[in-house]
Amino acid sequence: MTDSIIMIMSETLGVSIDANTSQSTCEKWDSLQHLHIVLALEEFFDLSFEPEEIATMKDVATIEQLIQQKIKN
C-alpha cells in the first residue's frame, strides 16, 4: 500500500517522495496540492475522507494509517 500512496503522491506533486516525506519536508506540498492528493487517494482507493481526517494527513505514514483504517471498516 505504501508504494501506491507514494506513486500517487509523487505523480500529484511532480516530485520524488519516499515513506518519510511530510508536508514540512516537501516544498511542493502546499494546501492546494494537499487537496489534489486527497482527491487522487480517494479515487484510487475508492473511499472518502472526513474533513477532520484530511487535516491530519501531514505525512505518508499517517495517510497510510488512515487508509488502512478505512479499508478495515
Predicted regions and their residues:
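Amphipathic alpha-helical interaction surfaces in cytosolic regulatory modules
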Residues: 30-38
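Thiotemplate assembly-line natural product biosynthesis machinery
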Residues: 1-17, 68-73
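Phosphopantetheine carrier-protein modules
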Residues: 11-28, 44-56
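C-terminal structural segments of small proteins and small subunits
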Residues: 48-72
